[in-house]
Amino acid sequence: MVVHALVREDGTVEGGELYEVAGLLGMTDQQVRLCVKRLVTEGRFTVAGRGRRAVLRLTGAAGPAGAAGPGLPLVPEVEFVRHAYRQDGGLEPWDGVWHAFAFAVPESARAARDALRDTLTALGAAPVQGGLYVTPNAIGPYVRARAAELGLPESLSCLSTRDLAVGGTTDPRALAARLWPLPEIAARYEALHALASREAGAAEGPVAGLARAVALAAAFSAAMVPDPLLPPELLPQPWAGATARAAAAAAWDRLAGAAPADGPRLFRLYGEALA
């Protein structure tokens, strides 16, 4: 992730900067060398030169210079990040509707079945029982599109209701606490908040600023990617996610303001996500 985070708009990574930033993040030179070797072997980067004098270049296999690239969990989907901030600002109130998705797929199509299940969980839906998932968010268009891609449109059933009961639980907040691991989600955001709230040292230079940006991006993704983005109406208040996202946005503004004009594309990608 450190290597990808330091890719500049022209698709290159300077070896000296990579080793310095990685060192500040606790990585050894040997770990950096092994990481670079793996990325080159996988065809994600080419490299010219050796060690700190090397220049790495992103290949087409790693995606265009304006995108995060396969296997790079740096920037969660911009649309969902913006939705989270709108929720925090009270601009996306819950309408009280639950959205349920059920599917029955034979073992012969196991790979497609697993892919559909992974899509549902990635979109924040929680399993209720075998083949049945539920969420308070209107993710139907995404789920139906994915089912069609997988050749499973006839295997998917969709339903919306204001009357959901799971094992006798009907209260919306109680259902949220039952179906989603809220303490685990909150803990990831608490870690993000702690990192985002740290003040930079007075003598902090550009390399240290880059290291802080990479660490903040990693913590933001670690918290946001598995977050089902439940509406505030279903969450304990104050919610750790809203507090952490506000702190992260403020920290990112500070870091981006001090970043060099030709700095890593990471600043643009996160700037777009938080805009």
Q: What are these model-derived regions, one by one?
A:
Residues 1-9:
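Positively charged, polyanion-binding regions of nucleic-acid-associated proteins
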Residues 12-22:
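Short acidic, hydrophobic short linear motifs in intrinsically disordered regions
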Residues 33-37, 117:
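Short, hydrophobic-biased segments on the C-terminal half of alpha helices
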Residues 43:
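Glycine-centered, phosphate/nucleic-acid-interacting loop/turn motifs that mediate DNA/RNA or nucleotide
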Residues 49-55:
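Short, Lys/Arg-rich nucleic-acid/phosphate-binding segment
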Residues 63-98:
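Short, amphipathic alpha-helical interaction segments positioned at domain boundaries
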Residues 105-199:
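Mid-protein regulatory/catalytic core that forms ligand/cofactor-binding pockets
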Residues 170-275:
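C-terminal regulatory/effector modules of DNA-binding transcriptional regulators
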